[in-house]
């Protein structure tokens, strides 16, 4: 959202109590959104309705109350969803007939961060016109509607049940998990109630970890960013597999029956292969610049079209829409199954993997036998007084990059990525031989380091 004063591409996020992540600003934000929605409704006589969901971090109580007060003061009704995965809020916004949805979450970040993300009535990112109107409304003083036009707030008590039924509807009616022992790591986050309940209803024996949030333990040593915890529990309990979500439930990673971690690249391979066999796969599978070269090679062997987008689930989504595809994802566990959900949904994605395993009569480990990952490593080269763009475009760096790409041609990849958030250039090399990979990485990163000095 270039040129915006307050918002980035995915709402706002930061340290609680600093900048826009404050109760004062969020109160004004709720009021501004309420006024925009009231104006959009015009004279039809119905108050706009906004649903609010959150993850489990302690500051969510403060921001939920602030948003509620601001919206109600502007004349909008509010339905409080309580702790709810981000994709669930998108689904509920789309299906409850409301005007907008809000998620209070900082995803996989620590508890001391938080953020605000918006959904349109269609459960998608707000359009440019609404975003611009919201920015403009924030520069207008707080407004309280006349008493008879004030909004009301209520709890959406059927929200959990509706979302669970949606998740169940994403798998065949006859599918169940009877006889399956699985470990669920909910990151002490937004999936802590829904995920164990859902998988038990499907018949699984569920061993739960990371399902006791206290407001400050979200993502702390648990969840998809700490997969070793899940792996150890799988080995300890002799489970068939483990599933780990992140704090807001839009990412999923797994561990096989031996406790080996299974990342988003692995899960993408399992789904693509299964969906091709089922005739469900359409268009290209979309990965990112960071997807392992072994995945690309495996897809080529299977004659599955594969394209790469920039890093970030929104770019994966964009590439899928443009290419008419239905399956994409990144190693971090953001998976998009667009024939089942409009956004990345950790629970729905996990269910699709379990269906693929059941249909193929395979364990997680067996389903990965056709995939040979190659060694991959990234080095961050910190910049001096030279910009990232100038560093990457330097003749010496371009020559070193061309030489690196030639040395791993047909065996891997070498590429550079200027960071968008810090003064570094990321140097990545992968190859089917670890020594070749390391030597190539050393030469290329040295050239970048010299140009950046």
Curated annotation (Swiss-Prot):
Residues forming the catalytic site: 107
GO terms for cellular component: cytosol
Cofactor detail note: Binds 1 Mg(2+) ion per subunit.
Co-factor requirement: Mg(2+)
Record's catalysed reaction(s): alpha-D-glucosamine 1-phosphate = D-glucosamine 6-phosphate
EC code: 5.4.2.10
Top-level EC class: isomerase
Transmembrane regions listed in the UniProt entry: none
Family that this chain belongs to: Belongs to the phosphohexose mutase family.
NCBIfam families xrefs: glmM, PRK10887.1
Name of this protein: Phosphoglucosamine mutase
Organism from which the protein derives: Stenotrophomonas maltophilia (strain K279a)
Lineage, opening ranks: Bacteria, Pseudomonadati, Pseudomonadota, Gammaproteobacteria, Lysobacterales
Gene: glmM
């Amino acid at each position: 959202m270039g040129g915006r004063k307050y918002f980035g591409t995915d709402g706002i996020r930061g340290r609680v109590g600093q900048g826009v992540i404050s109760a004062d600003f969020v109160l004004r934000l709720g009021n501004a959104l309420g006024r925009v929605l009231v104006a959009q409704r015009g004279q039809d006589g119905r108050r706009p309705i906004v649903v609010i969901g959150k993850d489990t971090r302690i500051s969510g109580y403060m921001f939920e109350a602030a948003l509620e007060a601001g919206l109600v003061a502007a004349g909008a009704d509010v339905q409080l969803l309580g702790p709810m995965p981000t994709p669930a809020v998108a689904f509920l916004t789309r299906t409850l007939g409301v005007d907008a949805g809000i998620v209070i979450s900082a995803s996989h970040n620590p508890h001391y961060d938080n953020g605000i993300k918006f959904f349109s009535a269609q459960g998608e990112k707000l359009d440019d016109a609404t975003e611009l109107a919201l920015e403009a409304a924030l520069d207008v003083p707080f407004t309280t509607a006349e008493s008879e036009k004030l909004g009301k707030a209520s709890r959406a008590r059927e929200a959990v049940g509706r979302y669970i039924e949606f998740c169940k509807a994403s798998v065949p009616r006859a599918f169940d998990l009877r006889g399956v022992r699985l470990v669920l790591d909910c990151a002490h986050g937004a999936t802590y109630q829904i995920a164990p309940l859902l998988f038990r209803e499907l018949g699984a024996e569920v061993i739960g970890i990371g399902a006791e949030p206290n407001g400050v333990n979200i993502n702390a040593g648990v969840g998809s960013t700490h997969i070793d915890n899940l792996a150890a529990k799988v080995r300890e309990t002799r489970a068939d597999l483990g599933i780990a979500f992140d704090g807001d439930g839009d990412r999923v990673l797994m561990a096989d029956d031996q406790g080996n971690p299974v990342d988003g690249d692995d899960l993408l391979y399992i789904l693509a292969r299964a969906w091709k066999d089922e005739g469900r796969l359409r268009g290209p599978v979309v990965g990112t610049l960071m997807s392992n070269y072994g995945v690309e090679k495996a897809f080529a062997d299977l004659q599955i079209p594969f394209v790469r987008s920039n890093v970030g689930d929104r770019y994966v989504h964009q590439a899928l829409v443009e290419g008419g595809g239905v399956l994409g994802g990144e190693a971090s566990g953001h998976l998009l199954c667009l024939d089942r959900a409009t956004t990345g949904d950790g629970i729905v994605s996990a269910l699709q993997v379990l269906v693929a395993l059941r249909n193929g009569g395979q364990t997680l480990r067996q389903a990965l036998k056709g995939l040979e990952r190659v060694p991959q490593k990234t080095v961050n080269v910190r910049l001096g007084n030279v910009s990232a763009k100038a560093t990457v475009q330097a003749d010496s760096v371009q020559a070193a990059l061309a030489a690196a790409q030639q040395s791993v041609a047909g065996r891997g990849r070498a590429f550079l990525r200027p960071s968008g958030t810090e003064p570094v250039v990321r140097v990545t090399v992968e190859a089917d031989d670890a020594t070749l990979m390391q030597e190539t990485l050393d030469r290329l990163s040295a050239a970048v380091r010299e140009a950046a000095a």
